[in-house]
Structures are given as structure tokens and as C-alpha cells.
Amino acid sequence: MVTQRKDFSEKEIEAVWEKATKQPNNTPDVFRKDYAGAWIRREDYGKRDMPYGWEIDHLKPLAKDGTHDFDNLYPVHWRNNESKGDDYPRWKTVLSSEENRNVESEKKWKVDE
């Protein structure tokens, strides 16, 4: 069982960024959306002090036998990652978007295993 966080390489960060959803009329190398619909900005990786900061989330948390495998990694706005924590297979996110801005919006998620 993997229990330790890891520092991701720039190559890994870029590969996970590619999983974020591209949006029409936006520069996909700069802005995309996470799975909850929150805007994230590429250069704000790891920056919790930025409005579009994002992190790499382990969909199935390491604390629940998740792995660092690419299929388990997702780009997520830091507030959604913080809200999710180690919750799995059910969790909630707290941020989505309306047009070009992020807004408070609680959504519940569930993975069928």
C-alpha cells in the first residue's frame, strides 16, 4: 500500500493537466476546468493562494489503498481537493463556475466500484 505523497515531476504535472477539460474560446494552455467545472490555470499548480490554483488529486486516496498510477490522478482546483480530502467512494466538491468565473457550488460525487 502506498501511503506517502510524492513530488510530481514537471512531465507528470503536464500529463495530469492534459486531463483537465478544454473550453471553447479559451486558451487551453492557460485555462481549463476540473471535473467539478471549476476554472484552473496551468501556471497556478500548487498555489493555494491563487484563485485558479490547482493540485493533483488521487481519485482513490492513498489512505484508502489508492496509488500514484496515472489513471488515479486528476487535476483539481485546490478548494475542491481540500473538500474531497480522503473521502471515497463518496465525496463533495465546493467550487464550480458560471461563465468565466468560479462560484461556490456544492456537488456530490460517487464512484461505483
Feature-to-residue mapping (PLM):
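Short, Lys/Arg-enriched charge-dense amphipathic segments
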Residues: 15, 46-60, 93-95, 109-113
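Glycine-rich short-loop/terminal segments
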Residues: 1-5
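Polybasic, low-complexity binding patches
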Residues: 65-71, 82-113
